[in-house]
Amino acid sequence: MAKEAEMEFEGTVVEVLPNAKFKVQLENDIVIDAHVSGKIRMHYIRILPGDKVTVVISPYDMTRGRITYRKIAKKAEV
């Protein structure tokens, strides 16, 4: 039996929790718990409140997810 496909959502980090966990508010205003993927952790990428991130959620548990990408904020031109 094949695994069901994971779903990707865009969201904003609302709160930083201990042990590399975060509260992320998705585009549809649902707040979920998310942890950092291994590649982000391995490369010491910092995630702060307000960062835009991509979250992968399993269809089996829609309350938890995994942060797979942090969007780079555009710098304002002067």
From Swiss-Prot:
SUPFAM superfamilies: Nucleic acid-binding proteins. Transmembrane segments: none annotated. It comes from the Bacteria. Pfam families: eIF-1a. Residues 1-72 form the S1-like domain. It is found in: Cytoplasm. One of its GO terms (molecular function) is translation initiation factor activity. The keyword Transmembrane does not apply. Disulfide bonds: none annotated. Keywords: Cytoplasm, Initiation factor, Protein biosynthesis, RNA-binding, rRNA-binding. One of its GO terms (cellular component) is cytosol. Belongs to the IF-1 family. Component of the 30S ribosomal translation pre-initiation complex which assembles on the 30S ribosome in the order IF-2 and IF-3, IF-1 and N-formylmethionyl-tRNA(fMet); mRNA recruitment can occur at any time during PIC assembly. One of the essential components for the initiation of protein synthesis. Stabilizes the binding of IF-2 and IF-3 on the 30S subunit to which N-formylmethionyl-tRNA(fMet) subsequently binds. Helps modulate mRNA selection, yielding the 30S pre-initiation complex (PIC). Upon addition of the 50S ribosomal subunit IF-1, IF-2 and IF-3 are released leaving the mature 70S translation initiation complex. NCBIfam families: infA. This is Translation initiation factor IF-1. It comes from Mesoplasma florum (strain ATCC 33453 / NBRC 100688 / NCTC 11704 / L1) (Acholeplasma florum). The lineage of its organism: Bacteria, Bacillati, Mycoplasmatota, Mollicutes, Entomoplasmatales.
